[in-house]
Amino acid sequence: MERAKILVVDDESRMRKLVKDFLTREGYTVLEARDGMEAMDLFYEDKEIALII
């Protein structure tokens, strides 16, 4: 079964990496955004995003 795609949004790259590494180990596909504007752009481009953190 394919896991959900998750968008991680945080202005601190270390925090994004920490969350991404954890979720990737659990089998999720993870996208990253630096801020809200970038997150909205990614969200509208990729209709498979199931969760935004």
Where are these regions (language model features)?
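Intrinsically disordered, low-complexity peptide-like regions
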Residues: 8-9, 19
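Phosphate-coordination loops involved in phosphoryl transfer and adenosine-cofactor binding
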Residues: 2-3
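Short, flexible segments with low predicted structural confidence
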Residues: 10-11, 24
